[in-house]
Amino acid sequence: MGTDISDIVVSHQTSLKDQANQVFAIDTYNILYQLLSNVRQYDGTPLMDSSGNVTSHLYGIFYRTVNLVENGIKPIFVFDGKPSPLKNRTLEIRQLAKEKAKAELEEAISRGEENLKQYYSRINYITPQIVNDTKELLTYMGIPYVDAPSEGEAQASYMTRKDADGVISQDYDCLLFGAKKILRNFAIYGRRKVPRKNVYRTVYPEYVMLDEVLKKNGINQDQLIEIGILVGTDFNEGIKGIGAKKALALIKKEGNIKAVLNKIGKNIENLDEIIDFFKNPPVVDVKYVFGKPDPKKIEEFLCVVHDFSRDRILEHINTYVKYYNKSVQFRLDSF
């Protein structure tokens, strides 16, 4: 979900080729939820193998990783760890929304509706099996992954202050965590339908630079965090009626979030803890190593274990190995 500060960010249209020869830390759960929502069969049910295992995520991770490497990008996947207790309320709200969607799905089925995608797409769970399958596929593809101690986007953002060039994520929360660069829309560009509306718009890959956002708005990192909190984050609901532009104006006028809250007579529970979490989240220093792809293992895992089309997979495996060899050169260098 993240924080909606889009009205005050500076974004630049780009292409994957323009980002070549860079290392990107990927907010993996952000990507997995996209895949589980969007990669579905015509009736809305997720892709599954003959054993009934969901494979939507494997389809998406494989093809998106091929696309990244083909364009010269070195990806490192970052997985979420244990969520902060500050996130409990948000997780409860999401669970209630899923239960409501389940009830609506059952009603739609009983009415005989055929297109159930809008219901299924709102009921997504990242299970331990989905996580383990994703890691297994990445291992066969020679792609490193990192287990974050807590929030994946916090770990990925921290990595941009070390060795990574940026974060791949749709969430602007990464800016609050200090990511120096975000790459958005890398896999959803093109003509896309606006959710719940019969309207289409063209989406392009874009990048956002943290320093540019701060400079444009005349604020520092602490103030950006406080703007995000006023708008709402995964750790708080925000103040009703305050969007990014209004939050920016209030912070610049009053100086800090506590002065703003005092001025408008509002309160944000656990404010100090939320601010501290954005500034000092649990992260780890890691050494990531790019391995050598194992085409046979990739083929066996996708085509034998999970029933993917062999002809199509083999074609893309060959493409992947070709470009991986060129961009990563099978070196066991750490970044």
Curated annotation (Swiss-Prot):
Its top-level enzyme class, in one word, is hydrolase
Q: List positions binding Mg(2+) 2.
A: D171, D173, D234
Q: Which GO terms describe its biological process?
A: DNA repair; DNA replication, removal of RNA primer
Q: Does the keyword DNA damage apply?
A: yes
User: Where are the residues of the annotated region I-domain?
Assistant: 115-255
Q: Which GO terms describe its molecular function?
A: 5'-3' exonuclease activity; 5'-flap endonuclease activity; DNA binding; magnesium ion binding
The UniProt entry, under Pfam families, shows: XPG_I, XPG_N
Q: What is its EC number?
A: 3.1.-.-
Q: Where does Mg(2+) 1 bind?
A: D27, D80, E151, E153
Classification via CDD domains: H3TH_FEN1-Arc, PIN_FEN1
**Positions of region (N-domain):** 1-98
The record's InterPro entries line, in alphabetical order, gives: 5-3_exonuclease_C_sf (IPR036279), Flap_endonuc (IPR023426), Flap_endonuc_arc (IPR019973), HhH2 (IPR008918), PIN-like_dom_sf (IPR029060), XPG-I_dom (IPR006086), XPG/Rad2 (IPR006084), XPG_CS (IPR019974)
Provide this UniProt record's keywords sorted from A to Z. Answer: DNA damage, DNA repair, DNA replication, Endonuclease, Exonuclease, Hydrolase, Magnesium, Metal-binding, Nuclease
Q: How is the cofactor bound?
A: Binds 2 magnesium ions per subunit. They probably participate in the reaction catalyzed by the enzyme. May bind an additional third magnesium ion after substrate binding.
Q: Which cofactor does it need?
A: Mg(2+)
Q: How does it assemble?
A: Interacts with PCNA. PCNA stimulates the nuclease activity without altering cleavage specificity.
Name the family the entry cites: Belongs to the XPG/RAD2 endonuclease family. FEN1 subfamily.
Job description of the protein: Structure-specific nuclease with 5'-flap endonuclease and 5'-3' exonuclease activities involved in DNA replication and repair. During DNA replication, cleaves the 5'-overhanging flap structure that is generated by displacement synthesis when DNA polymerase encounters the 5'-end of a downstream Okazaki fragment. Binds the unpaired 3'-DNA end and kinks the DNA to facilitate 5' cleavage specificity. Cleaves one nucleotide into the double-stranded DNA from the junction in flap DNA, leaving a nick for ligation. Also involved in the base excision repair (BER) pathway.
**Listed name of the protein:** Flap endonuclease 1
Q: What is the lineage of its organism?
A: Archaea, Methanobacteriati, Thermoplasmatota, Thermoplasmata, Thermoplasmatales
